[in-house]
């Protein structure tokens, strides 16, 4: 069944790039993917073309201040980044018509970077209030800005030296570091390590104890991320994948917090969306899937790297392609919420 967001086959949508006018394309279609053991079908219900080369991360602004919609409207607000530039795309999409407006900002000058250099950004996260942060994989740093993308709030180095096993694989494989990020309470962040091996890592101020995660460790509606005073975030704890999670996810491309308060993982190599366990304790050693809750992505979605889930439990998937004239953002049919 095609959702109301797709009223027509193709739709031209306006956006502004640093004051210039262009178009992104939206179209509706129905392509599904189903695998034995997966929970139902996922179908592509909308496509967009975001002019970000090698799109690598998505974040949703749950404003209003508690939903993914702009107050008084039925719009969804998203951010998108790529690893090839310092461009940040801000999208507002009308849930009913599919109309979208977008602004693309080159934030290199704000961060004191050279515009022509690759950002190596692989993840983006926001507290939906006044902070947005981008994770640079090979540089092992997180840069934070205000939501208007006009002010730098801080750049933080990731220090993994305190965990010997992590330090070894981090240095040995710089292209298999951070691929996903969630902001938490107390200035802590969860960062997803891509592969060899895949891990979930909790970073925070030096001397802090790891929290793990549950409903009390994630930022609540309207709660601001507590920016640490130290410019170094220390690895406090690692959780490797359980055998079952490793079977479902050959790599780890993105994590996001859904509107149901649950953590979802995207695997590019396995073309799979997975709901992780509800509670992860600090004294546990591994992280696993929640009651085998996983969904295969529809055929044709390759190199999936960005993931958010909107208020209607619809996954949005961003793909990493070099072509700017092809669809790289896909809206999928809803998944069931976690308990």
Outline where the language-model segments fall.
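Sequence/structural signature of beta-propeller domains
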Residues: 23-339
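Bacterial N-terminal signal peptides
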Residues: 10-23
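Bacterial N-terminal signal peptides that target proteins for export
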Residues: 1-13
């Amino acid at each position: 069944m095609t959702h109301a967001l797709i009223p027509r086959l193709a739709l031209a949508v306006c956006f502004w790039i640093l004051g210039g006018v262009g178009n992104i394309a939206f179209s509706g279609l129905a392509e599904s993917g189903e695998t034995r053991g997966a929970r139902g079908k996922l179908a592509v219900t909308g496509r967009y073309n975001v002019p970000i080369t090698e799109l690598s991360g998505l974040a949703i602004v749950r404003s209003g201040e508690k939903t993914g919609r702009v107050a008084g409207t039925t719009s969804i607000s998203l951010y998108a980044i790529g690893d090839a530039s310092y461009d940040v795309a801000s999208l507002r999409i009308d849930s009913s018509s599919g109309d979208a407006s977008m602004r693309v900002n080159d934030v290199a000058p704000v961060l004191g970077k050279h515009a022509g250099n690759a950002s190596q950004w692989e993840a983006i996260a926001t507290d939906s209030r006044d902070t947005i942060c981008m994770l640079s994989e090979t540089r092992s740093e997180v840069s934070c800005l205000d939501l208007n993308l006009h002010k730098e709030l801080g750049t933080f180095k990731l220090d993994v030296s305190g965990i010997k096993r992590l330090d070894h694989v981090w240095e040995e494989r710089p292209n298999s570091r951070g691929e996903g990020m969630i902001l938490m309470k107390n200035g802590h962040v969860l960062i997803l390590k891509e592969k060899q091996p895949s891990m979930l890592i909790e970073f925070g101020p030096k001397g802090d104890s790891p929290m793990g995660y549950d409903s009390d460790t994630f930022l609540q509606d309207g709660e601001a991320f507590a920016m640490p005073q130290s410019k170094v975030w220390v690895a406090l704890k690692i959780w490797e994948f359980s055998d079952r999670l490793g079977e479902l996810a050959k790599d780890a491309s993105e994590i996001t917090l859904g509107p149901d308060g649950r953590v979802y993982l995207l695997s590019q190599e396995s073309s799979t969306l997975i709901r992780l366990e509800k509670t992860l304790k600090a004294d546990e050693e591994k992280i696993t899937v929640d009651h085998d809750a996983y969904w295969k992505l529809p055929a044709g979605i390759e190199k999936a790297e960005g993931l958010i889930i909107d208020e209607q439990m619809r996954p949005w998937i961003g793909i990493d392609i070099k072509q700017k004239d092809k669809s790289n953002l896909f809206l999928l049919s809803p998944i069931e919420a976690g308990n």
